Each structure stands twice: as C-alpha cells, then as structure tokens.
Amino acid sequence: MSAPDRELLEAASAILDARYRTGVHEVAAALRLADGRVVTGLHVEASAGRASVCAESAALSAAVVAGSPVVSIVGVLQRPGGSRHLIEPCGVCAELLGDHAAAATVWVAVADAFGPVPVPDLLPHRRRRAARPV
C-alpha cells in the first residue's frame, strides 16, 4: 500500500478508534481528494435498515461538499472482537461512487490480497440513468 493510501487507512482507523459501537458504527471510510485533502465518513446504523448510512456514502457526501474530485478510497470494518479488515463498498455505494467518483480507485480484495481497482470495475454492468429504447 502506498504512503498516501496508508494515510487513508490510518484516517479511517482513527474514526473507528473514536466512534466504534457494535452494530451501530462498524465501518469507516476515508477518501483522498485531488487537492490532497482527506475526508472521512462513518457507518450509521438505523433501526429501519434502509435508513442506515454507509461510511462510503457519508464520506462521498463530504467530498462533494469539499468540491474536489475523489482520487482514492479506503474502507475499514471493525468486528466486535476488535479485529479490523479492509472492506469493499456495498452495491449501493458502488453505484454512488460510479456516479460521483468514477475516476477514483478503491481498495478491494484481489485474489488472496488487497489492492486498488478503478471504481468502474466494482460494477462493470451497472445501471445508467439514461433511458434506453427496448
């Protein structure tokens, strides 16, 4: 992992150090912006599942507010026992990232290790908003 991406891993881990709660805040994400800034987001679980907010979505919102394109993404999951793992975005977050951070790379499982892949590779056949004639 490059030094800039390791910084993202550390930023996401710091969020979990400060805010982790089992079943409520288990994932943190950090995004590097083109201007060098790092924004973070935290998973916020709701009692009604669909109302929950993923860490990647929260961080992406912060990136949009910051006004600079996203270049790299790292997500970290903490298990109740304290172990932490890199985690790839869920399908909904992959859709959002495809719409708003398509030029970025995201860390995911690649074979037996982790590595950065282009966001469009997360969902190579994702839906597009434009209507297509049948």
Q: Where are the language model's segments positioned?
A:
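Short beta-strand scaffold segments in enzyme catalytic cores
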Residues: 27-33
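Short glycine/proline-enriched turns and hinge-like loops at secondary-structure junctions
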Residues: 23-24, 53
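Short glycine-rich, polar/acidic loop-and-turn segments at beta strand-coil junctions
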Residues: 33-35, 43-45, 77
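C-terminal binding/interaction regions
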Residues: 1-22, 66-134
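Feature captures the catalytic cores and cofactor-binding loops of soluble hydro-lyases/lyases
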Residues: 58, 62-63, 85
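Compact, glycine-rich, soluble single-domain proteins
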Residues: 42-57
